[in-house]
């Protein structure tokens, strides 16, 4: 039937998201950060069109919802965790921290754990049909991918203390499950009229992409997150 065909189309796109996420994991484990970011971006594109198809075709199913969450936790939870894990392994550890150097990299998997919690929360939260509460997992993954790929040399230098990275992991893990309302790029369709704010946001992002290149994703996500934090300080 037509309805079943629409569901299969959506699930195919979800599987492409998962496939790209698996490749991102391999690239991250091999410390090929730019390639890992590339496949996370590809996963986020598939995830975007997955949601767009679901809304445009009304192609919703219980299996599709579960499959989407599983794909997202690999692409946007495990992949960025492996990026940060590999980075921790490369970082300079002062003599006073040598005892913790073999163990600290595993803190990177807090990203996977809190991404799974965020996805489970999202699946059962009726407030998030048109906007987000807490940082979306694709945004978190793009932040880590672009930060590490764009500022790798600085992050592995003696000027960057591993504790700073650990604090950042904890902060963004908390943002994933926080009660802070966040901007959403959910498109109902591709018309300007129905998605004016989202299109304007994308246009504003262009200068970031031009001037900051790979690091632009991190800069955009930090800027948006900071804006929401300031706007909702009472939540803190």
Describe every region a protein language model picked out.
Residues 1-4, 8, 228-236:
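Single conserved hydrophobic/aromatic residue that forms the stacking wall/gate
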Residues 52-61, 116-128, 177-185, 229-230:
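C-terminal ends of transmembrane helices
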């Amino acid at each position: 039937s037509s309805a079943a065909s629409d569901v299969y189309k959506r699930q195919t796109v979800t599987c492409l998201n998962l496939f790209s996420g698996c490749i991102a994991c391999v690239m991250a484990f091999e410390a090929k950060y730019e390639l890992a970011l590339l496949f996370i971006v590809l996963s986020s594109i598939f995830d975007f069109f997955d949601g767009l198809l679901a809304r445009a075709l009304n192609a919703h199913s219980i299996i599709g919802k579960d499959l989407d969450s599983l794909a997202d936790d690999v692409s946007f939870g495990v992949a960025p965790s492996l990026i940060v894990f590999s980075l921790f392994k490369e970082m300079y550890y002062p003599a006073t921290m040598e005892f913790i150097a073999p163990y600290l990299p595993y803190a990177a998997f807090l990203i996977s754990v809190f991404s799974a919690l965020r996805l489970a929360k999202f699946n059962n939260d009726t407030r998030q049909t048109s906007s987000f509460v807490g940082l979306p997992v694709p945004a978190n993954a793009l932040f880590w991918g672009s930060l590490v790929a764009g500022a790798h040399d600085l992050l592995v230098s003696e000027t960057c203390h591993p504790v700073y990275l650990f604090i950042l992991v904890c902060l963004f893990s908390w943002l994933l499950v926080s009660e802070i309302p966040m901007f959403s790029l959910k498109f109902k369709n591709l018309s300007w009229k129905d998605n004016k704010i989202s299109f304007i946001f994308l246009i504003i992002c262009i200068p970031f992409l031009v001037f900051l290149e790979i690091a632009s994703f991190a800069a955009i996500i930090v800027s948006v997150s900071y804006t929401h934090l300031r706007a909702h300080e009472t939540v803190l």
